[in-house]
């Protein structure tokens, strides 16, 4: 069953963990060890479907907080931007549903961090605070 799901979701062509998840800045990849109890929710986010398998989301862990971003090139059409944001929303849902299933405590809050060396074309969405 897992093999069938991975094929259907094109999981073997998903971006690597180190290109999606970061620790304190966008130059330092987040390790699964650093993610701790949030390894599985982040993995479910990584495996979430996206248009053309682009996986436009990025996550930055800072302290007890996970900041979520969406990436897209400047100059894309409004429709393409909306699709990227919908993809990120679906991925966030995968993250949140896994958090709930695991019984992890936390909450979403709009608090964009400053001074994190935000890469070009990377746009803040929301943050998840762990408890």
Predicted feature descriptions by range:
Residues 1-131:
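Acidic, surface-exposed loops and disordered segments
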């Amino acid at each position: 069953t897992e093999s069938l799901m991975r094929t259907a979701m094109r999981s073997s062509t998903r971006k690597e963990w180190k290109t999606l998840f970061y620790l304190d800045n966008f130059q330092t990849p987040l390790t699964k060890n650093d993610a701790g109890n949030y390894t599985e929710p982040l993995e479910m986010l990584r495996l979430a479907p996206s248009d053309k398998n682009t996986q436009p989301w990025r996550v930055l862990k800072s302290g007890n907080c996970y900041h979520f971003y969406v990436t897209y090139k400047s100059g894309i059409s409004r429709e393409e931007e909306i699709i990227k944001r919908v993809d990120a929303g679906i991925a966030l849902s995968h993250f949140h549903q896994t958090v709930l299933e695991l019984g992890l405590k936390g909450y979403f809050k709009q608090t964009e961090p400053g001074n994190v060396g935000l890469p070009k074309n990377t746009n803040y969405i929301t943050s998840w605070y762990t408890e």
